[in-house]
UniProtKB/Swiss-Prot annotation:
This is Nucleoside diphosphate kinase. Gene3D superfamilies: Nucleoside diphosphate kinase-like domain. It catalyses: a 2'-deoxyribonucleoside 5'-diphosphate + ATP = a 2'-deoxyribonucleoside 5'-triphosphate + ADP; a ribonucleoside 5'-diphosphate + ATP = a ribonucleoside 5'-triphosphate + ADP. Major role in the synthesis of nucleoside triphosphates other than ATP. The ATP gamma phosphate is transferred to the NDP beta phosphate via a ping-pong mechanism, using a phosphorylated active-site intermediate. It is found in: Cytoplasm. Its main location: cytoplasm. Its EC number is 2.7.4.6. Belongs to the NDK family. GO terms for biological process: CTP biosynthetic process; GTP biosynthetic process; UTP biosynthetic process. The active site is at residue 117. The gene is ndk. InterPro entries: NDK-like_dom, NDK-like_dom_sf, Nucleoside_diP_kinase, Nucleoside_diP_kinase_AS. ATP binds at residues 11, 59, 87, 93, 104, 114. Keywords: ATP-binding, Cytoplasm, Kinase, Magnesium, Metal-binding, Nucleotide metabolism, Nucleotide-binding, Phosphoprotein, Transferase. The lineage of its organism: Bacteria, Pseudomonadati, Pseudomonadota, Alphaproteobacteria, Sphingomonadales.
Length: 140
């Protein structure tokens, strides 16, 4: 397996409940290494740009409002098959459907406040990483 990178956001519901460390611990225990991390308060423009792919979906406005409601932690994760590894440890989007031991099953509040975002492909990971990080901010 090749070592690859993926992108993760610890969402406002998790940072509000002081779960940044718990989420990061679960990511690291799943074999992922944090090679870049910063706590930010997304602007409306950042959130709308990041989630532009969902612009025509009925939940877009609520998603943007949620993502700007408090601080988030954006991270670049590295590991073998990082996208899959991250998605596996995150669990299903709906915490009710997530497997025991996953971030969403153990820490999420609801399908909307589901604690984490993770890239769905290596291609999207590269785009999402570049959206928030300069190359020199990523140190492996």
């Amino acid at each position: 397996m090749a070592v690859t990178r993926t992108f993760s956001i610890i969402k406002p519901d998790a940072t509000r409940r002081n779960l940044t460390g718990a989420v990061t611990k679960m990511l690291e225990e799943a074999g992922l290494r944090v090679v870049a991390s910063k706590r930010i308060h997304m602007s409306r423009e950042q959130a709308e740009g990041f989630y532009a792919v969902h612009k025509e979906r009925p939940f877009f406005g609520e998603l943007v409002e949620f993502m700007i409601s408090g601080p988030v932690v954006v991270q670049v994760l590295e590991g073998e098959d990082a996208v899959k590894r991250n998605r596996d440890i995150m669990g299903a989007t709906n915490p009710k459907d997530a497997a025991p031991g996953t971030i969403r099953k153990e820490l999420a509040e609801s399908i909307e406040a589901n604690s984490v975002h993770g890239s769905d492909s290596e291609e999207n990971a590269a785009i999402e990483i570049a959206y928030f990080f300069k190359p020199e901010e990523i140190v492996g």
